[in-house]
């Protein structure tokens, strides 16, 4: 009887081990988008402050990504104040540039935006608005589609940007990849003024690479999730839309199976 029980425990242990080894990776993180932070706006300041507290209260979040329109007016003073608040986060955070974030004639170019980010040491120094980072076996690629000379609501991913993206997708071909950007290439709803220029070319590019599992975006101030050719396109609502909320995303990859992606909108309680 004793030997029988030992065999049962051995078999159970082997099953548990095999199940555990089959799971290639799991990660849980938050997406905050379209904060539109403004100076002298008590509501927006309070929303962002309470959002930071909410994010800090969740120990299971690996990091936070802000997917553009972090500030409402492209001025250094506004960006500095925004950074002052999000520096209270107790976990790593990453920034994407949106159409409200930069305006070269106003004195806040993409180059200067990146310089200010690097001054605050939010994460490792970056060379430009396009960059990558790794977390728990996943690769995240930040892709810039904003225009700094004449900012506008139409997203524009330059050829050199897409060429750079393709290089990264080849480089990280053995990793599950999540792309983070401001302008979606699969819109949550039809709004011509917010469309992305030649989105079909971008889609064709990622369709060539099996490692892309999701694309995160904002811009539309709307919640939307669509699957296209095996890639999960996630668009999240603006933080300042009533009720204020951000999105928690959990991704589980299992060998031999399609990735499982779970999302949850987390409401921010304003006190």
State where each predicted segment sits.
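Bacterial N-terminal signal peptides
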Residues: 8-18
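Extended active-site neighborhood of metal-dependent phosphoesterases/phosphodiesterases
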Residues: 76-166, 171, 201-211, 225-261
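Short acidic, glycine-rich surface-loop motifs adjacent to enzyme active sites
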Residues: 170-189
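Short, solvent-exposed aromatic-acidic interface loops
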Residues: 262-271
């Amino acid at each position: 009887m004793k030997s029988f029980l030992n065999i049962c425990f051995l078999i159970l242990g082997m099953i548990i081990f095999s199940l555990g080894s089959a799971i290639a990776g799991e990660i849980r993180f938050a997406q905050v988008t379209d904060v539109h932070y403004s100076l002298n706006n008590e509501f927006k300041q309070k929303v962002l402050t309470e959002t930071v507290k909410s994010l800090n209260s969740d120990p299971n979040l690996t990091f936070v990504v802000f997917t553009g329109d972090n500030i409402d007016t492209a001025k250094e003073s506004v960006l500095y104040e925004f950074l002052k608040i999000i520096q209270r986060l107790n976990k790593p955070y990453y920034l994407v540039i949106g159409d409200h974030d930069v305006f070269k004639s106003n004195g806040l170019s993409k180059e200067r935006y990146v310089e200010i980010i690097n001054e605050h040491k939010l994460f490792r120094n970056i060379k430009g608005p396009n960059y990558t980072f790794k977390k728990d076996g996943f690769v995240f690629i930040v892709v810039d589609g904003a225009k700094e000379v004449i900012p506008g609501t139409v997203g524009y991913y330059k050829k050199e940007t897409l060429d750079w993206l393709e290089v990264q997708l080849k480089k990280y071909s053995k990793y599950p990849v999540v792309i983070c950007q401001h302008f979606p290439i699969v819109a949550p709803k039809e709004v011509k003024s917010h469309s992305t220029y030649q989105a079909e070319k971008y889609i064709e590019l990622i369709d060539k690479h099996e490692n892309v599992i999701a694309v995160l975006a904002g811009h539309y101030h709307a919640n939307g999730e669509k699957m296209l050719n095996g890639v999960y396109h996630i668009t999240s609502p603006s933080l300042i839309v009533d009720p204020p909320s951000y999105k928690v995303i959990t991704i589980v990859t299992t060998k031999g199976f399609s990735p499982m992606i779970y999302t949850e909108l987390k409401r921010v309680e304003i006190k």
